């Protein structure tokens, strides 16, 4: 178990030893997509990746690409402007190869798998009521069809508290690298907006 600061220090050491960020992102995306592909029932109605502005969003875009290449009906939705150059490159490539980009928020009552890649480790951003409501509605309508990458949106990765008393409360969280301290705590109760 590691805190966000410990995980960031581990990553800094890896990068200082020559590990390319791009290679790590590929490893993460391939691992997550393999986990999902091993559970075909999750993707029988397709999947939507909710892409955040930073590196977590980039991880989600690699997952989207790998699932698309495996023949999964996949779409991406970006509710925020992308802020990281590498994430933008993965987004541009996803568009070039034909992955559908949703212009409007996805239907939370659909039976498609949602892969939440909005914020991840060290999140401090307050999530809008609209996003919270969307994630909570998805969790209620399809309890097993909401997966978070690394740390669920709205959850403080160090103490398990919710950022502004909200959290996506994913059915599964696929941790990257090492388990995060927040997972020791009881699952948070999200506020439904």
Model-derived features: positions:
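Positively charged, low-complexity intrinsically disordered leader regions
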Residues: 1-40
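Nucleotide and nucleotide-moiety/phosphate-recognizing core
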Residues: 34-117, 128-148
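Short glycine-/acidic-enriched loop or helix-start segments at secondary-structure transitions
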Residues: 59-60, 124-127, 156-160, 183-184
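Conserved beta-alpha-beta core of the PfkB/ribokinase-like small-molecule kinase fold
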Residues: 147-163
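Short, glycine-/small-residue-rich phosphate/pyrophosphate-handling segment
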Residues: 158-184
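Single conserved hydrophobic/aromatic residue that forms the stacking wall/gate
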Residues: 185-193
């Amino acid at each position: 178990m590691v805190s966000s600061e410990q995980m960031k220090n581990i990553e800094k050491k890896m990068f200082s030893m020559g590990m390319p960020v791009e290679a790590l992102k590929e490893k993460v995306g391939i691992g997550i997509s393999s986990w999902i592909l091993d559970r075909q029932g999750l993707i029988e109605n397709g999947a939507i990746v909710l892409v955040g502005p930073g590196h977590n969003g980039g991880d989600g875009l690699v997952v989207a690409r790998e699932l698309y290449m495996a023949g999964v009906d996949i779409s991406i939705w970006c509710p925020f402007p992308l802020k990281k150059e590498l994430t933008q490159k993965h987004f541009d490539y996803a568009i070039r190869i034909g992955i559908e980009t949703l212009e409007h928020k996805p239907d939370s009552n659909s039976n498609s798998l949602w892969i939440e890649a909005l914020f991840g480790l060290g999140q401090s951003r307050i999530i809008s009521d609209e996003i919270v409501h969307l994630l909570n509605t998805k969790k209620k309508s399809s309890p097993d069809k909401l997966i978070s990458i690394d740390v669920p949106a709205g959850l403080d990765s160090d103490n398990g508290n919710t950022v502004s008393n909200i959290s996506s409360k994913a059915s599964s969280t696929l941790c990257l690298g090492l388990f995060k301290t927040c997972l020791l705590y009881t699952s948070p109760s999200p506020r439904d907006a």
